[in-house]
């Protein structure tokens, strides 16, 4: 199994009429999703070829991009880790470097690294019906453009816009004499020792940064518009570490993973069915952690738990910093920045030397790649999800969008397994094309693709694929159900049409009729 070299733009190794691609699968992204797909291919499709196209110079994706203080997982590594590779560290809530080490070790031990083309940004991908393949065009840092053809395009590029975060605009920003930083572009040599820091935001990024910066900063203030629900849990999983001492690594990992998956699922469903009970539980934990520092106004959100993702606070580290007087949380609205800090609408002023704008991320679908079908631009928002990874009337395209109520990698594992079974079925049947077919008069009841109120998700609704009320045409948010259903659901389910290459003149009327 090998990976093709990328060809200079305009150069082809085969005639333009050939239906033989350079590789079976072009994987976009060398983060969790991409490395996971490569590993699954080597286990399940050893006769198939692939290439990983990665715009950065390192493995890791999100975990290589974000470098702010304390960067860590917001899920336990027994579920954020892959199903096939045990997590061996003592801490189950892992920091960024440990996650990078995990990914790099997998890439090296499994021989994945030689298949990665680093410094390669994917610009576009066009599906050619006549040849039944994708032509993927790329550009390196020197501006050299190349292309590669693939039977299947696998988008493991995550959902963050790496170039443009959601950076809220504040009046008077240019007046501030200190340093303003967005966490997505953290400077490597920032010196904040002895300085007053204000972190704007109360999401996972802010909750991570605040306690981490208190070790050097004079004081750190989290400035929030509205409170967030926090979940306190130990950074180390006592059961996992006990099992590792008495059982084989893979067995201990599987037991812990099963336990954590079921617990995640139970908590989410309980939050939706009995929100008051979950509120009481979370509040009691926060009160116990803060003691007399607890303030109901600061820690009582105007929404139910899991209407937005819970923010994890490992070992109650942020609350320990607040108790120690090294950090505090202010609930207010910003009027404007000034020379020495932030003027709030309440009239209060926050003095600051450094302001961190942890105001959110901008979501993107498919890594902002210009996708087209026989030269006609494709818009994800015009298509329904199929089995949470393919799209109505779009051939040979698989994309990963992880769970919102559980670890990202849980869905990535399911999708990699499905994609490999799809590849094997296509090869066994002599098929070149796999298309989830949806008739124009489908009658599907459309549902909200995100059943969450988080701002970063709501801002992205216009670019997201559609999600129906019923399977298989939806992005489901229940891993336990999905795992059983995806395994039991056959590839040839009466919806996914398998076929061979056909001229575009024949393919286009079929697509138009389906749409």
Where are these regions (language model features)?
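Short FAD-binding loop at a beta-strand-to-alpha-helix junction that anchors the flavin cofactor
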Residues: 80-82, 180, 388-405
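Short beta-strand to alpha-helix junction loop
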Residues: 87-105, 117, 200, 270-278, ...
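Feature captures the FAD/FMN-dependent oxidoreductase FAD-binding
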Residues: 90-161, 289, 336
């Amino acid at each position: 199994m090998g990976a093709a070299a990328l060809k200079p733009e305009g150069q082809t190794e085969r005639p333009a009429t050939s239906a033989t691609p350079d590789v079976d699968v072009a994987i976009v992204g060398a983060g969790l999703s991409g490395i996971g797909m490569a590993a699954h291919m080597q286990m399940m499709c050893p006769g198939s070829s692939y290439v990983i196209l990665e715009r950065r110079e390192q493995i890791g994706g999100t975990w290589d991009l974000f470098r702010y203080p304390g960067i860590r997982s917001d899920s336990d590594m027994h579920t954020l880790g892959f199903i096939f590779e045990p997590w061996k560290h003592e801490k189950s809530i892992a920091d960024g470097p440990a996650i990078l080490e995990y990914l790099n070790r997998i890439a090296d031990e499994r021989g994945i690294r030689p298949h990665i083309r680093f410094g390669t940004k994917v610009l576009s991908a066009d599906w050619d019906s006549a040849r039944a393949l994708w032509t993927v065009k790329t550009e390196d840092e020197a501006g050299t453009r190349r292309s590669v053809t693939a039977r299947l395009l696998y988008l493991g590029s995550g959902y963050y816009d790496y170039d443009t975060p959601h950076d809220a605009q504040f009046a008077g920003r240019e007046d501030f004499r200190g340093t303003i930083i967005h966490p997505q572009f953290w400077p490597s040599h920032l010196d904040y020792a002895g300085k007053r820091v204000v972190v704007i935001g109360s999401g996972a990024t802010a909750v991570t940064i605040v306690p981490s910066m208190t070790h050097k900063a004079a004081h750190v203030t989290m400035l929030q518009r509205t409170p967030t629900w926090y979940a306190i849990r130990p950074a180390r999983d006592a059961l996992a570490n006990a099992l590792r001492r008495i059982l084989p690594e893979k067995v201990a990992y599987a037991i812990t993973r099963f336990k954590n998956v079921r617990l995640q699922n139970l908590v989410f469903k309980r939050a939706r069915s009995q929100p008051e009970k979950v509120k009481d539980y979370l509040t009691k934990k926060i009160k116990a952690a803060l003691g007399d520092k607890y303030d109901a106004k600061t820690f009582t959100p105007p929404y139910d738990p899991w209407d937005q993702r819970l923010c994890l606070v490992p070992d109650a580290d942020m609350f320990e910093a607040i108790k120690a007087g090294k950090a505090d949380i202010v609930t207010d609205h910003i009027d404007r920045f000034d020379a020495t800090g932030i003027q709030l609408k309440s009239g209060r002023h926050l003095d600051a030397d450094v302001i961190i704008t942890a105001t959110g991320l901008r979501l993107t679908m498919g890594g902002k790649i210009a996708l087209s079908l026989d030269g006609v631009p494709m818009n994800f928002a015009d298509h329904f999800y199929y089995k949470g990874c393919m799209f109505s009337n779009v051939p040979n395209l698989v994309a990963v969008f992880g769970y919102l109520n559980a670890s990202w990698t849980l869905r990535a594992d399911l999708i990699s397994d499905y994609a490999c079974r799809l590849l094997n079925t296509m090869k066994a049947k002599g098929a070149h094309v796999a298309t989830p077919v949806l008739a124009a008069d489908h009658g599907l009841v459309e549902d909200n693709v995100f059943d969450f109120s988080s701002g970063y998700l709501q801002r992205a609704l216009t670019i997201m694929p559609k999600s129906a009320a019923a399977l298989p045409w939806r992005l489901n948010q229940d891993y336990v159900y999905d795992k059983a259903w995806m395994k039991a659901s056959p590839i040839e389910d009466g919806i996914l049409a398998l076929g061979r290459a056909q001229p575009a003149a024949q393919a286009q009327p079929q697509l138009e009729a389906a749409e």
